[in-house]
Amino acid sequence: MMLSTEGREGFVVKVRGLPWSCSAEEVMRFFSDCKIQNGTSGVRFIYTREGRPSGEAFVELESEDEVKLALKKDRETMGHRYVEVFKSNSVEMDWVLKHTGPNSPDTANDGFVRLRGLPFGCSKEEIVQFFSGLEIVPNGMTLPVDFQGRSTGEAFVQFASQEIAEKALKKHKERIGHRYIEIFKSSRAEVRTHYDPPRKLMTMQRPGPYDRPGAGRGYNSIGRGAGFERMRRGAYGGGYGGYDDYGGYNDGYGFGSDRFGRDLNYCFSGMSDHRYGDGGSSFQSTTGHCVHMRGLPYRATENDIYNFFSPLNPMRVHIEIGPDGRVTGEADVEFATHEDAVAAMAKDKANMQHRYVELFLNSTAGTSGGAYDHSYVELFLNSTAGASGGAYGSQMMGGMGLSNQSSYGGPASQQLSGGYGGGYGGQSSMSGYDQVLQENSSDYQSNLA
């Protein structure tokens, strides 16, 4: 007997907006009027590549009638979150589950975990003791530092096998000292992607039009402080930073190969290209589709930010740490696509706890990653389109809304096209800057080459 189209595709719904701590049992209670195939095994959560819950799941049901019942739960609440329910199918479910999460082809079986929330001054020996009985590979521990040589509170640890790494994950939320430690699945690819700053950071470029001479960290200045020394030690070491006491695990972070250690020490990430002189961000985008946040509560966590953008699913959140080691109230949030980044801008001026948060778009249609410049603008932002080589700048125009083409002082025939939002900025009156920006962009891209 031929199966119907519905039978071949299965009876599946996709759920979005789940609380991060949600369990399969809670999903079953949410769909208590529906018959779920195989009980809790019919609830298939979607995870990020770092092993964090994405807030989404697929639910396999027993019939088309059960799917219709499940769809009636759309926009109902679970805890303090409203949950969206969409019709899906087994083809979509299988593809998504195969290509996402820490067990996707490019992240599986390398035994990495990422630790977050380490106490200030936490040593390698304390981490080894924390994972007592679990074998860590030689040179398999990395303690990233900021540009002043201070610990970021994170660590990457590579275990002797994926099975041992799975055991390590069970220590999630256990304590080192007075701090509870969060543990996520990771991978060699994540380590390199997260902390490999572009080589342009080794060059001294001339200042951009918005660099501030008195800003301290403007003009791409690089100081040879403790961070530089720690980088130098790690970058010349073998593996993931040199070997020292304990059988070693150097503090440095370098995958070392060429004269500066091809994948530079993490401390260089903190010395980002402040061409517009406005930030202390160590964030390096991998997709080119980001939103910068300003005005965050000082106690805001990554999970608070993920919740803030729900039901959108950011790929990565980076909370900025200032030179004094304290949070700055700013963060960079990376999205998979330009469309997601634009949709996230709907949250501009929304509240997080008692603070309203300003958002600034750092994304260009057609950009597929790479380095980019950004300037923060008040009240609104216009995003330039068609940037080449992944490098672009964000410019301000004279009206409200978002436009995907803009120019400082272009000719009168300059046209606006395809803007996002309800309004369009007027013709820029900031003549005289266009040539500077073009020269600066040319110089910037030549350095990237």
From Swiss-Prot:
Entry GO MF terms: RNA binding
Keyword Phosphoprotein: yes
Entry's localization field: Nucleus, Nucleoplasm
Domain RRM: 11-90, 111-188, 289-364
One GO CC term, this protein: cytosol
Residue numbers bearing the N-acetylmethionine modification: 1-2
Function statement: This protein is a component of the heterogeneous nuclear ribonucleoprotein (hnRNP) complexes which provide the substrate for the processing events that pre-mRNAs undergo before becoming functional, translatable mRNAs in the cytoplasm. Binds poly(RG).
Name of the protein: Heterogeneous nuclear ribonucleoprotein H2
